[in-house]
């Protein structure tokens, strides 16, 4: 039987279809606050793999309401992430995950412990979007600039307002966009995550980096690696990083009894 996981975050929807450990289909797209419509659209591409009944669960910060309305199983995203990590990288010591509007660290060695920032978009994908807009570049261009930096300027990342008051004077004084954009903005995200969430606990051993921002932005990956001084092979950026919660939701469904046809399930979402 196929297993479907749906992760609806603050800015994106992710859908995966699995058969055993094999991922048959996956999609990642922004929902622009049109959660129900975007989820149904994302499922259209999965239809070809769902000719028989399948099991499904929804996860994510914006998924609970839809799951409750549809009467579909919901799995908390930290638990879904844990499921994925145990399936693919079971020797992981810590997980750093950045989403559109939240950031979290999950410590796995020495007892499971989660630290999360969900009250402010500082140090998240939304912050990066805001800073790209301030610099009048796309997020892709911001990332490209970051890889060309020569120095790092300290800026705040607690929120876009404070960061803007740091960045604008730098630009006015002629600071290179590569230095401001990249390194400084991405370094601010790293500092916010490490300092704000670790709260003095060391991030060491094998660290798994998950979530869209940590998959798409190579400059952000670089800043985390250099800041944490992780040894060779200890910083892992998996190819499925942006789908980790959706994969975990799909894995979770293996223990469910309820199954649906494609028409039954999409009918519940409409």
Question: What is the meaning of each model-derived region?
Answer:
Residues 110-151, 159, 251-255:
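Glycine-rich phosphate-binding loop plus the immediately following alpha-helix
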Residues 74-78, 224-247:
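Conserved phosphate-binding/catalytic loops in two-lobed NTP-binding clefts
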Residues 62, 199-227, 238-242:
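Glycine-rich phosphate-binding loops at beta-strand->alpha-helix junctions
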């Amino acid at each position: 039987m196929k297993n479907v996981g749906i992760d609806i975050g603050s800015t994106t929807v992710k859908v995966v279809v699995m058969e055993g450990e094999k991922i048959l289909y996956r999609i990642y797209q922004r929902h622009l606050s049109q959660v129900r419509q975007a989820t149904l659209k994302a499922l259209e591409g999965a239809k070809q793999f769902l000719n028989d009944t399948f099991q499904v669960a929804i996860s994510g910060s914006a998924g609970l309401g839809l799951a409750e309305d549809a009467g579909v199983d919901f799995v908390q995203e930290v638990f879904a992430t844990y499921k994925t990590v145990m399936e693919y990288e079971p020797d992981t010591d810590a997980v750093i995950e950045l989403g559109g509007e939240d950031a979290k660290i999950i410590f796995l060695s020495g007892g499971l412990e989660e630290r999360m920032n969900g009250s402010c978009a500082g140090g998240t994908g939304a912050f990066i979007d805001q800073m790209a807009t301030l610099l009048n570049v796309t997020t892709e261009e911001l990332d490209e600039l970051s890889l060309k930096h020569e120095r790092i300027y300290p800026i705040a990342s607690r929120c876009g307002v404070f960061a803007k008051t740091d960045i604008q004077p730098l630009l006015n004084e002629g600071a290179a966009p590569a230095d401001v954009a990249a390194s400084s903005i991405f370094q601010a995200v790293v500092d916010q995550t490490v300092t704000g969430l670790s709260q003095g606990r060391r991030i060491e051993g094998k660290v798994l980096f998950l979530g869209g921002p940590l998959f798409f932005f190579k400059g952000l990956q670089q800043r985390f690696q250099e800041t944490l001084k992780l040894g060779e092979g200890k910083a892992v950026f998996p190819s499925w990083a942006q789908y980790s919660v959706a994969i975990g939701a799909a894995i979770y469904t293996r223990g469910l009894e309820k199954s649906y046809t494609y028409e039954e399930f999409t009918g519940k979402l409409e």
